[in-house]
Amino acid sequence: MARDEAQMELLFKALADRTRLRLLNLMAAGEVCVCFFVEVLGESQPKISRHLAYLRRAGVVSARRDGKWMHYRIAEPADAHAARVLSEVMTWLGEDHRMQKDRARMENICCAPSLPVRLQGAPRPAAVPT
């Protein structure tokens, strides 16, 4: 399989998983700490990290470490076709009712006056898509 074909297959496999779509949805407005993904999606940190690693391999997510916190954001794919596919997926996610519920849950958690104990000390996301 040619490199472009392999990358295209990886991208479509990355986008074919509901958890990964939910993660992309929550990153629509910017960088998010893993701990917020865990809280909003109600999944274990190892499961979330595995899905984020898959998205990184597909070239649609980038990461940075800040002390003990890992932050993820959507990355622009190098390939123009992949970038268009991701853009269309993000538009669809923005319009999907279930994804809007995830964004509302994120807003309720990160914008609450006090964070849940599990998130104490965690950096809040800069913005939450509404």
Language-model region placement:
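Functionally engaged cysteine thiol sites
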Residues: 33-35, 54, 58, 111-116
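N-terminal helix-turn-helix DNA-binding core of bacterial DNA-binding proteins
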Residues: 2, 6-47, 53, 69-78
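C-terminal regulatory/oligomerization modules of transcriptional regulators
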Residues: 1-5, 77-130
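Beta-hairpin "wing" of winged helix-turn-helix
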Residues: 57-66, 73-75
